[in-house]
């Protein structure tokens, strides 16, 4: 049969690349689950009253090459001026060995948060290195494995200061007036919901204010001044005030550690350790505190523990502080963080080592000294005598200076009265400094760089003697060993080999949507047109970004059924927080600010109650019925009981139990009836796209996990992106920004993230995904995700009961396997099964969430039938092994499950187990073998013997 030209062009080719099962395999699976077609299957599963008649109109699919060409043209509209704006963002030189072997390597960017440490030792080691860098530079005792950005880290520091403060009646937080404006913006937003009074004043006046529980200082002020705060900190500590200091990683290479000056908390951005500006992110924040406050710290902390054989092994420590366990009582709502970016910064430090970092920092400072000396010779005045990399230069004709800068394609900081700010960085050259002289002085200045360099080298006093670092940094061997590219490449590969990522096997984590992150989607994030823009550059220089973001927003509006989208939240947890703030401010605009009750189903993810608490709401739990659905009677009773104060409900759809609840519209109607708003958590949006939508269902606001449904990779624990979609009445209440006006959003609300568009440089990933899939491809992806989950459930249900199902015994895009009956019969737990799956070459499903004693499986649409069958075969083989334990063939205390995972060295070790070595390490044959490098972690030992810095190299060997 002759094909048409349209058929030969095959514009939907990417759909077949993204979706795992081909048409024939889909039909085999449909036959297995008893459905005629994808439409018939989804028609059976999804409630009729919420099914869309036609898919959202987001255009036809484009090929990978056409989409890349289209986006390249859009990116070309961005203007890459040389940026000296500073304010926490600088140009960087990302070492190519790290660019190629980490940022562009799916072995690093497709991994998940290291909840399963046995398959995560590589990135855990890199994160431990990041913590060591943080400890060395800050001079404190305990560091986290990254937070979302510097501004949110400041807000977390404020919240932590209140938690640990002994001044229980104090309710005021002092912020020095020269912190970055975006930091102050986010702090004010967070303080409002906590009921804190924020005082902004000159740091010297901090002691003049009473009832202050915490103080935020910035070691190098926003306009460049280095502060010696040691005396002030000492006086504040005498008053029992918790002191937080914002600092700069590169400056700390030369400057005294704030921890040594008495600071309780030190935080900042690790961006300038190799991570491009990317129009605002993603970037990792660092966060450190005194040991006495460790259990009040936010975010992930990597600790050193031991495995079952007594060998050194790494794990996430003190997880009982976190939202997935403590819910509304958690230290923070942070779920993921910025692992990929923290690891880039970590390896940047490893690659350069202490000598290289000092060379870079000294070069930056020397060029700044040269610039300062030349300007002062010509009569210009500097606002600050002490500086590291930033000058605040008073100019008589500011407009003329800025005009010359624009003509030279240079951006200076322009928001300072009668002055300009100039921040140099590791990319700055002597030629750049000469060009800056031309901009500030005109072409006939007559200054000579070499002459100025000699003068500066003999007499530089721009860093106070008291502020010069006098201790060694990064003395651990890991920072002094891998400085040739060969050594660095091999070190990074050795770490990568320890981990299990999507480039090796399916990661069937329920509620996580570990789908394909296609190469074509990833390519644009390293284009300089996207990577090199400062987030506060003039808007006319970012027209490409604005066009891309506008198109993506328009597509997301259509896919969600909402009226507007805000791109600022840089994680799903931040999206929840921003959405709840929009609801809060909406009620306040109607003189109903007393509405503060948030209804949350018992099955909800831990971020929901944690976010509600952060937004200043009180959580009331709604019961679930025996089928796992929201108990409508309990909902009505509690909505009516709290009618006067009902703010909202937070509900996930399909439910966290993996079912399309039939009564979701009724849930929305009940809440609206009593004056509340409906927050629909977008965690399971991958089962909605093209089939239904939150807006069509009746919700008012949702966050979207772009790192789930829309293909941004998880990065081993971040970056994420959590934009919110809202109905029109909530649009005026989404986050704004104090530095940059967000076009199209008429909002005066405070910011929730440091940058106006959050982690803007990863938005091209989602743009590419939607552009290449088109309307039909997006719908088909949701349908195949549902098919894959039902195929697994139907084949495993006789071996492992499926805990919750909807109509006709179907599940949505994930299923919960109930291990509790097996545990009661045999003593084998969900943990044993999870660890045994490692021997079969798989990452475990989600354990004990949302129900203790279960495994939640989400295969996504990207896994083909062969991989699904391999997983099913592994689960059935494990069930047969459990039966061996039940029959007494293997004792409960010594069998392949309780001893899992097994490592390579056991092949040649003494063997006294009642099962063979082959059963231990090759249960599925040798073809798909993954070798973990440690045995099962000893969690109790790790928390009782907390150690969160680098261990001797020999311990890794």
Swiss-Prot record:
CDD domains listed in its UniProt record: GDC-P
Q: Tell me which UniProt keywords the record has, alphabetically.
A: Oxidoreductase, Pyridoxal phosphate
Q: Which residues carry this modification: N6-(pyridoxal phosphate)lysine?
A: 708
Give the record's GO CC terms.
cytosol; glycine cleavage complex
Q: Name one GO molecular function term.
A: glycine dehydrogenase (decarboxylating) activity
Q: What is its EC number?
A: 1.4.4.2
The cofactors it requires, by name, are: pyridoxal 5'-phosphate
Give the matching Pfam families. Answer: GcvP2_C (PF21478), GDC-P (PF02347)
Q: What class of enzyme is it?
A: oxidoreductase
* Alphabetical GO biological process terms: glycine decarboxylation via glycine cleavage system
InterPro entries in UniProt: GcvP (IPR003437), GDC-P_C (IPR049316), GDC-P_N (IPR049315), GDC_P (IPR020581), PyrdxlP-dep_Trfase (IPR015424), PyrdxlP-dep_Trfase_major (IPR015421), PyrdxlP-dep_Trfase_small (IPR015422)
What reaction(s) does this enzyme catalyze?
N(6)-[(R)-lipoyl]-L-lysyl-[glycine-cleavage complex H protein] + glycine + H(+) = N(6)-[(R)-S(8)-aminomethyldihydrolipoyl]-L-lysyl-[glycine-cleavage complex H protein] + CO2
Please state which protein family the record places this protein in: Belongs to the GcvP family.
Q: Which NCBIfam families match?
A: gcvP, PRK04366.1
Q: Its quaternary structure?
A: The glycine cleavage system is composed of four proteins: P, T, L and H.
What's the stated role of this polypeptide?
The glycine cleavage system catalyzes the degradation of glycine. The P protein binds the alpha-amino group of glycine through its pyridoxal phosphate cofactor; CO(2) is released and the remaining methylamine moiety is then transferred to the lipoamide cofactor of the H protein.
Note the HAMAP family from the entry.
Answer: GcvP
Q: What name appears for this protein in its UniProt entry?
A: Glycine dehydrogenase (decarboxylating)
Q: Which organism is it from?
A: Salmonella agona (strain SL483)
